[in-house]
């Protein structure tokens, strides 16, 4: 039987915390038209301006969370790759990053050289966005066309509402929910509003809605924010969370454009003003801990919350290589994958 490789796809990381490595990574990331959706000349100008100061600032942030083994995202993704092998009996399990190493191109060429003819992609993004899911899949298409690879490729679609994914989230978070706390904040990665408006053409679609109940199926399929709300609502129901004891926010905004709300930094101050002293934060848009969780929330967010008057902020780890997540990912990749 022809082997079917499972290719885990995530965003990526600099090779090291050196400023030049961070600059190279940021340049590749920000020059992606799915990330900064401006015409090439404007994008090049904007990114060049960003790269004057941002690499040194980001290098400092990466240094604060870097492990002896390397980038936390890469290390944790490698652990997931290893843990997945017993759950994917159809062929090898490989890992690639959209930016940085291991590059999608290198991994696909290696699979082709080894005689692999079937590949199942597993983009590790629960919710859909052009800047994550689409760009990863488009890079796979580009590599296959550029090298004329004879690969039959299928891909795991976004799984924001899949019961096995939600159950894995609940199981991984449950020990933290059993600790004394006042509130749970689900902080998702943010996105410029225009990224959603380009895809969801319905002018009545509400990007400030507090829940996903009235979202049409057509809008839900394309609206990252609505999918995040759907994940949060389903998680809260499964975890038995009381209304008012949890909320949703969006982090990591960049630049002056309007991003989806509410913003996490503003939400942290609001929760303190509401009397929340002990805060739990989970980041369900990420399946592996990275700079956005460990540094932005676990360090800067915690410092902000305590400085504003809170007593403690506990960052709940991402799914990483939790056994429930490993099993869920294997099951979904086999059951849900569709032709690319």
From Swiss-Prot:
GO terms for molecular function: ferrochelatase activity; metal ion binding. Pathway: Porphyrin-containing compound metabolism; protoheme biosynthesis; protoheme from protoporphyrin-IX: step 1/1. It comes from the Bacteria. It is found in: Cytoplasm. The keyword DNA-binding does not apply. It catalyses: heme b + 2 H(+) = protoporphyrin IX + Fe(2+). One of its GO terms (biological process) is heme biosynthetic process. GO terms for cellular component: cytoplasm. Fe cation binds at residues 189, 292. It holds the Pfam family Ferrochelatase. Keywords: Cytoplasm, Heme biosynthesis, Iron, Lyase, Metal-binding, Porphyrin biosynthesis. InterPro entries: Ferrochelatase, Ferrochelatase_C, Ferrochelatase_N. Its EC number is 4.98.1.1. Catalyzes the ferrous insertion into protoporphyrin IX. This is Ferrochelatase. The gene is hemH.
């Amino acid at each position: 039987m022809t082997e079917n490789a499972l290719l885990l796809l995530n965003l990526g990381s600099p090779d090291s915390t050196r400023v030049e490595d961070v600059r190279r990574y940021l340049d590749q990331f920000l020059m992606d038209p799915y990330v900064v959706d401006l015409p090439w000349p404007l994008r090049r100008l904007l990114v060049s301006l960003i790269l004057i100061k941002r690499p040194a600032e980001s290098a400092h942030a990466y240094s604060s969370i870097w492990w002896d083994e390397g980038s936390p995202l890469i290390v944790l993704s490698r652990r997931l790759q290893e843990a997945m092998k017993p759950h994917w009996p159809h062929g090898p399990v490989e890992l690639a990053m959209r930016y940085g190493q291991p590059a999608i191109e290198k991994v696909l060429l290696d699979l082709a050289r080894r005689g692999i003819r079937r590949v199942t992609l597993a983009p590790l993004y629960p919710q859909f966005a052009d800047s994550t899911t689409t760009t990863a899949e488009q890079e796979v298409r580009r590599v296959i066309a550029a090298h004329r690879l004879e690969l039959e490729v299928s891909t795991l679609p976004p799984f924001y509402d899949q019961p096995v994914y939600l159950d894995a989230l609940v199981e991984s978070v449950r020990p933290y929910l059993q600790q004394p706390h006042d509130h749970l904040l689900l902080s998702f990665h943010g996105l410029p509003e225009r990224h959603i408006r380009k895809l969801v053409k319905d002018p009545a679609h509400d990007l400030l809605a507090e829940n996903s109940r009235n979202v049409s199926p057509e809008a839900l399929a394309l609206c990252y924010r609505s999918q995040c709300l759907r994940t949060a609502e389903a998680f809260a129901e499964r975890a038995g969370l009381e209304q008012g004891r949890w909320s949703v926010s969006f982090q990591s905004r960049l630049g002056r454009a309007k991003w989806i709300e509410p913003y996490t930094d503003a939400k942290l101050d609001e929760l303190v003003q509401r009397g929340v002293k002990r805060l739990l934060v989970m980041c369900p848009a990420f399946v592996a801990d990275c700079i956005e969780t460990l540094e932005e929330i676990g360090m800067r967010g915690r410092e902000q919350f305590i400085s504003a008057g809170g007593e403690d902020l506990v960052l709940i780890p991402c799914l990483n290589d939790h056994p429930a997540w490993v099993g869920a990912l294997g099951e979904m990749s086999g059951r849900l994958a569709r032709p690319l």
